Regions:
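A hydrophobic, multi-pass inner-membrane permease signature
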Residues: 2-296
Length: 296
């Protein structure tokens, strides 16, 4: 018995091939800058000065990473950033869900006004000076909490969570209430397990935000041993550039590095850890983004 096959027109085939080629090229264009920095970080001083590094490292060596990890502050920076990212992501995701859930209920009195206030914060922010004065007045200057608390709840993430909660049938909650479940039991036992994809997406957004945060350290932290990783790497790069401007060839000859290879190394060091997390949440990430895009 012959199976019916849907014939594909020539135009559709051409369109499919074009899409594959176009998006492959686009993907390569987007990935190449990062690939180039990785290859440059493994290249020799001579190759980086001549600018001949393109697809593969030239004069392969690990001198750049030896210089980067020779700085003891890099380890305290990793520690601070890891603590901030883990605690901030866990608390931020939970608080975002707990904020969005009641806002998704039509029976909430003043819910529209509250949602308007949430949207208002996306358009008008308090600014740097009021934020600095607030942190100073509540006694959090030079405290690691100053790196965590300001970014706990994002209006954008709250809207994504609210959009997903609206898609959950209310009949599930009604059935749970008939069985005697409280609001907290419904939230933690029914709503959150159904929201894994969205929660993973929000957690990834939040984690990347905390991991890449540089400005908060500059504003609120004075002690070097409490600096986040991004501030440590930026300070390291600045010191390297200044040293090479003053001593020039002597410093480069001693370390077999220059400002460009150090910059490439710091980019890799700061980016790779957060990239390792992505494959574990990838299956949830696409679904979560689509939910936010369609229902938002």
């Amino acid at each position: 018995m012959e199976k019916n096959k849907i014939k594909t027109s020539t135009g559709e085939k051409i369109f499919t091939v074009f899409n594959y080629v176009f998006f492959t090229v686009l993907c390569l264009i987007m990935l190449y800058p990062f690939w180039h920095e990785i290859m440059l970080s493994f290249s020799s001083l001579e190759a980086s000065l001549k600018g001949g590094v393109f697809l593969w490292p030239k004069g392969f060596n690990l001198d750049t990473y030896k210089s980067v990890f020779k700085n003891p502050n890099i380890y305290t920076g990793f520690r601070t950033t890891l603590i901030v990212t883990v605690i901030g992501t866990a608390l931020g995701t939970l608080l975002t869900a707990m904020t969005a859930y009641p806002l998704s209920k039509s029976r909430l009195r003043g819910g529209k006004v509250m949602m308007t206030l949430v949207l208002f914060t996306m358009i008008f922010s308090a600014g740097m000076i009021p934020s600095f004065l607030l942190i100073q007045n509540i006694g959090l200057m030079d405290n690691i909490l100053a790196l965590i608390l300001p970014g706990l709840v994002s209006a954008y993430n709250c809207i994504i969570m609210k959009s997903f909660f609206l898609s959950i049938p209310e009949s599930l909650e009604e059935s749970a209430r008939i069985d005697g479940a409280t609001d907290l039991r419904i939230f933690f036992s029914i709503i959150l397990p159904l929201s894994k994809a969205t929660i993973a997406t929000i957690a990834l957004f939040t984690a990347v935000g905390y991991w890449n945060d540089y400005f908060s350290t500059v504003l609120y932290i004075r002690s070097v041993d409490k600096w986040a990783l991004q501030a440590v790497l930026r300070n390291m790069l600045t010191n390297t550039q200044q040293a090479m401007q003053q001593a020039g060839v002597n410093v480069m000859a001693q370390t077999n590095t220059n400002a460009e290879t150090i910059k490439a190394g710091t980019i890799v060091v700061s980016t790779v850890p957060i990239l390792i997390v992505y494959p574990f949440v990838q299956k949830y990430f696409v679904k979560g983004v689509m939910i936010g895009g369609v229902k938002g």
